[in-house]
Design a protein with these regions (language model features):
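Positively charged, low-complexity terminal tracts
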Residues: 1-74
Length: 74
């Protein structure tokens, strides 16, 4: 069975010394998930962080993110 992942959508956001990548992928099983990558320049190298949000968790993740953004923008 193949474990290949298919990229369906990608968005890149530059923010100062950081770059964020929002990638929607599809697993071999057909399940979709969001991968958020952060790349930050640290000295001469780059630091990378990643979080994966699975399709069934998107509604609650989105709700929480909207609340946080609303709080920050007050």
């Amino acid at each position: 069975m193949s474990t290949a992942k298919k990229e369906l959508f990608s968005e890149r956001v530059k923010a100062g010394s950081r770059t964020y990548f929002f990638d929607v992928k599809e697993a071999a099983t057909g399940a979709k998930y969001l991968v958020i990558n952060e790349s930050k320049k640290v000295g001469e190298s780059h630091e990378h962080n990643r979080i994966m949000i699975f399709e069934e968790d998107i509604p609650s993740f989105s709700e929480g993110l909207q609340k946080v953004v609303g709080f920050i923008q007050k």
